[in-house]
Amino acid sequence: MSLVYQAGTLNTTALTVPNLYVQIAQPQTLGLTGASSSKLGIVGTAGWGPVGAPVPMGGMSDYLAAFGAKQNAVTDAGLAVNIAALQGASSFAVVRVTDGTDVAASGSLGEISVEAAHTGTAGNGIVVSVSATGAGYALSVSHAVLGFANYSGVDWMALAAAVAQDLSALITVHLPETVPDVVAGSVTLSGGLDGGVPSATDFVGQDEAIRTGMYALRGQGCAIALLHGVNDQTSYSLQAAFGLGEGTYMIAAGPAYDTVTNAVAVKAASGLDSPAVKLMFGDWLWWSDDVHGTMLVSPQAFAAGILSALSPEQSSLNKALSGIVGSQKSGLSGSSATYSTAELSTLFTAGIDVICNPAPGGAYWAVRCGHNSSSKATVNGDNYTRLTNYIASSLAGGMGAYVGQVVNDTLFSDIRATLLGFLSSLLSQGILGVQNGELPYSVVCDSSNNPQTRTALGYVQADVAVRYQGINEKFVVNLQGGTSVTVTSAGGSV
């Protein structure tokens, strides 16, 4: 009788019984899928939702369901989501932070205590009602923004169990030792508090078993992240370390109403000099909010939003931004005051970017430099940080399949094929580009960089070199005009 095996489970050099042996080989794929380059992590405040836990979402509708309405606060996470989404961002991970003095709203229905599932002022709008039905009782929970839910049961124990089984329930029901009969009634929860304004330390959080703040974004695959409204320079180095470790481009900002001289001095004193952090000048922007009207907000979400919407080889330089109606520099009435070349030069030389109007392309709001905070010209572009992180994350996410395989020429060939295939796809999609007819990448993985002395110890090495495309930052047009100018045409006549 013939036997069927999965390939690799049968030692075909030790067969003793004459028979038919069928080995099923799994389809081999040498492809490598790119990592996400658009996910934006936001750490901010909110009036509802879990604290210290990253919540994935696609836009404002998801945010409203998870964290409630936007608040009139510069640290509000919903404000950042709204601004970034308007620039084209569509993938978020939001972490709510508090100062620890937040309180959940509560109320009672007779002897039954009802408490909001999360802390915050949004819980004050939750209405809980109990009514009799033909089969028992109905417990109705509703909120104008957070939604509603209905539960049914024959008594309070059944109703409480139904609420407990709902992972998205807006309330928790606490029963006394002696559970009373159900009595129809209604209550609006009250007493919910957001607490005070969290400190920069609260926003950074703790990198422990239970992570909080910025560290809650660890492992979430965020290509870009920001601590919304935080301008404390003591957090810059921590953001840089996190960004380097996670492959995340951190967007920081200076305080509102900052000056060029102070911004340069503060950055120098903080020691920030890293391609992992983009530092925006503290010229905060006037934003036209659909709920709270005109608000003065940090430039972080604008820069992060446009970067999230762009392919990783792109720069934020000169890309039009939406929703801005003015800035501290220019005022609300239009671009009445603009930056001088000297001011821009001072900021850019110090590794500080700014959003202003006009931009090189015309009278619109845009990021003016497209640089990170590094002082090294070879690594200070948005495109360097984002494309390097993208390629590294893609390799980290797919090349691990080769660990544990036997080291031989076939393995070297498969590794090369996978890497070359991935880089070729970047070339075909315009993320990489041919210059002077030469491929912008090379891969070496053979005996030349894997001698037996190394492979015998379990090491395999692939050397990958990738040349990025430059960004046109200083466009020079040489014009010669006059009646005496001789013009040479390439051929033909008009």
Model-inferred region functions:
Residues 447-494:
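C-terminal edge-of-domain segments
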Residues 1-415, 422-449, 455, 494:
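A glycine- and small-residue-enriched flexible loop/hinge signal that marks low-structured segments
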